[in-house]
């Protein structure tokens, strides 16, 4: 139910009558932005005299409107306000009937969606950048589910490639020590340390070999400089992680780690049983830790999709390369044994820029290595085909803007293979990076802030905030406040804008934070806890201006949900909830609820209940935990 539906229809009917009186063949649309009233419409393009428009409006002044008031003409604008009493009745009726589903309308039902998010490499803990991905994807799924769409959430496990093999080789070199560490630390954290150390050892070995072959002194000096950088990385890792990293260096220092990784990856992709056993042991350890982190945020995954199973062992990625070579030999080139598809020429020739919503520049794409093994983009095409076959109307892939070209290549290759509908079905839900002031992250160098660290610090800082308010319950609720603050921080900004993560903003108790919203909810809850059951309240003819504003804001909730789900923008919900909370807190300071006279008291209790109902629905969509004390 949408409380604004009847008022909007009544205004539209009035516009129809005005247009008829003026002899116009069409009715102007209602403006999205307000002009001189809640509803406005422009008559500018009809080139009529403003006096005629004013006269036509005045003829309707006694039309007995139920839901709008103050119909007027200002220049060539026709405007109307809302009848606050009738709007209040519509709001209370909708809230009573819909309960926690208030905000849902049939227009929100868009079909079925496969949402893929997070999909982090299984070699280290989720870091702060993965946090934005995971929280965005989870809130998209929640928003779609709130609107009764069928949704399934997937995580793509990228278990192939040299980086996973580095983690596997390192882990098996210090397996006994690693298992001891895992008894007292998260497995993804332990494997992450091992991976960073193994990668550094591999890079040092590779660079040393290259330096030995270098003929040019300047090039040799450059390589030695790079070696020194990686030695510094190892030194820093040993200072922070001690014995475990030292053991990795001791046992791998004289081995050709890079060569071993290539060979292990070849065996794994070929389906060698022993390679599968050792690699999957490490991958599953990391996924166990990543699952724990996601669970902390209230995020659930419906299905874990392994790259090896869906793209490599199935032979799908290889078939894609063969089919492109067969269909489009004129767009295929060979460079040093690698297969390259001229996606740039293909797009130009078939004019696909707008059809596939492509970026302005498209480079050629390499499909295989020189040894014939397929690369990431080819496997991603195989995965996209598998996703499309699962029977969903849309496939939403939450992937950073850094992969804009890779995701464009996926759509182009699908189109080239004859899967035009699949290419159009896939949505690359792009998002920008999270910046931590003063820090540049690199997982390969073991330099990143894990999502667990962010959540730990959020809980710790929240505990100190909460102690000032309720010292006896600080420890119990600090985690929920921390989770709410982090989730809101990642959702309140447009996905296409970078986030600068600052604690003074994330935990702001006065506005625009998850903490502020939770604090507002506790205020509403505490009022209703002391009040008798919410009864069907009558709406007074006269009310405070803040009460009118609150009723209008609550009435707008269904349209906010509708716009958010159509645009796939949870930040619309975050922005709306912040505005609602600001209005409610201002009202809370001015208007007594429980001590008001009987008729007014019932109305205000119903108003507070409506605010609480909307906050609960919004909290579900954003994944913010509800609190009853703070």
Curated annotation (Swiss-Prot):
Motif ('HIGH' region): 120-130
Statement: the UniProt record of this protein carries the keyword Protein biosynthesis: yes
Keyword Magnesium: no
Cystine crosslinks: none
EC number: 6.1.1.19
GO molecular function, one term: arginine-tRNA ligase activity
Keywords tagged on the record: Aminoacyl-tRNA synthetase, ATP-binding, Cytoplasm, Ligase, Nucleotide-binding, Protein biosynthesis
Superkingdom field: Archaea
Catalytic activity entry: tRNA(Arg) + L-arginine + ATP = L-arginyl-tRNA(Arg) + AMP + diphosphate
Gene Ontology CC entries for this record: cytoplasm
Gene3D superfamilies per the UniProt record, alphabetical: HUPs, Isoleucyl-tRNA Synthetase, Domain 1
InterPro entries: Arg-tRNA-ligase, ArgRS_core, DALR_anticod-bd, Rossmann-like_a/b/a_fold, tRNAsynth_Ia_anticodon-bd
UniProt main location, coarse: cytoplasm
Pfam families given in the database record: DALR_1, tRNA-synt_1d
Subcellular location(s) of the protein: Cytoplasm
One annotated GO biological process: arginyl-tRNA aminoacylation
Entry's family note: Belongs to the class-I aminoacyl-tRNA synthetase family.
Protein name in the entry: Arginine--tRNA ligase
């Amino acid at each position: 139910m949408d409380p604004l539906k009847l008022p909007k229809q009544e205004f539209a009917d009035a516009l129809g009558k005005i247009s008829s009186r003026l002899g116009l063949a069409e009715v102007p649309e209602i403006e999205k932005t307000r002009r001189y009233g809640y509803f406005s419409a422009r008559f500018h393009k009809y080139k009529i005299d403003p006096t005629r428009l004013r006269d036509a409006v005045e003829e309707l002044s006694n039309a007995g409107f139920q839901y709008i008031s103050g119909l007027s003409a200002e220049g060539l604008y026709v405007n109307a306000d809302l009848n606050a009493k009738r709007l209040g009745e519509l709001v209370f009726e909708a809230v009573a009937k819909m309960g926690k589903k208030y905000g849902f309308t049939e227009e929100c039902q868009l079909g079925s969606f496969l949402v893929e998010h997070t999909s982090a490499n299984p070699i280290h803990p989720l870091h702060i950048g993965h946090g934005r991905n995971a929280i965005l994807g989870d809130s998209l799924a929640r928003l779609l589910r709130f609107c009764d769409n069928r949704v399934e959430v997937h995580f793509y496990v990228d278990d192939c490639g040299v980086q996973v093999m580095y983690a596997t080789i390192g882990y098996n070199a210090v397996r006994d020590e690693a298992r001891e560490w895992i008894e007292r630390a998260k497995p993804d954290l332990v494997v992450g340390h091992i991976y960073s150390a193994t990668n550094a050892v591999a890079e040092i070995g590779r660079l040393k070999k290259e330096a030995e072959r270098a003929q040019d002194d300047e090039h040799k000096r450059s390589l030695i400089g790079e070696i020194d950088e990686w030695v510094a990385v190892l030194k820093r890792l040993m200072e922070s992680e001690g014995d475990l990293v030292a053991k990795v260096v001791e046992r791998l220092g004289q081995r050709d780690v890079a060569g071993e990784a290539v060979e292990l990856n070849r065996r794994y992709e070929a389906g060698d049983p022993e390679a599968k056993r050792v690699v999957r042991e490490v991958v599953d350890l990391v996924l166990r830790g990543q699952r724990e982190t996601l669970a902390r945020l209230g995020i659930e995954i419906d299905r874990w999709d392994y790259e090896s199973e869906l793209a490599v062992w199935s032979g799908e990625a290889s078939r894609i390369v063969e089919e492109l070579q067969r269909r489009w030999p004129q767009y295929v080139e060979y460079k040093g044994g690698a297969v390259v598809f001229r996606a740039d020429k293909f797009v130009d020739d078939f004019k696909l820029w707008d059809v596939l919503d492509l970026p302005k520049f498209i480079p050629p794409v390499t499909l295989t290595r020189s040894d014939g093994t397929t690369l990431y983009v080819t496997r991603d095409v195989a995965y996209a085909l598998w996703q499309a076959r699962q029977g969903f109307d849309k496939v939403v892939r939450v992937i950073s803007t850094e992969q804009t070209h890779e995701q464009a290549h996926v759509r182009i290759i699908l189109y080239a293979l004859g899967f035009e509908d699949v290419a159009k079905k896939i949505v690359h839900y792009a998002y920008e990076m999270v910046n931590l002031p003063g820090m540049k992250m690199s997982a390969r160098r073991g330099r990143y802030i894990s999502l667990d660290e962010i959540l730990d610090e959020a809980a710790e800082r929240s505990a100190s905030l909460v102690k000032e308010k309720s010292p006896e319950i600080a420890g119990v609720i600090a985690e929920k406040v921390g989770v709410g603050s982090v989730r809101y921080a990642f959702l309140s900004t447009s996905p296409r804008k970078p986030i600068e993560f600052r604690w003074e903003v994330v935990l702001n108790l006065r506005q625009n934070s998850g903490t502020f919203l939770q604090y507002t909810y506790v205020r509403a809850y505490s009022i209703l806890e002391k009040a008798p059951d919410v009864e069907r309240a009558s709406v007074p003819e006269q009310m405070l201006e803040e009460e009118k504003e609150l009723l209008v804001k609550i009435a707008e909730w269904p349209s906010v949900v509708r716009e958010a789900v159509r645009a796939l923008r949870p930040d619309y919900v975050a922005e709306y909830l912040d505005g609602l909370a600001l209005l409610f807190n201002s009202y809370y300071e001015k208007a007594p609820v429980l001590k008001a006279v009987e008729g007014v008291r019932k109305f205000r209790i119903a108003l507070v209940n409506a605010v609480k109902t909307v906050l609960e629905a919004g909290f579900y969509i954003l994944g913010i935990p509800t609190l009853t004390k703070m």
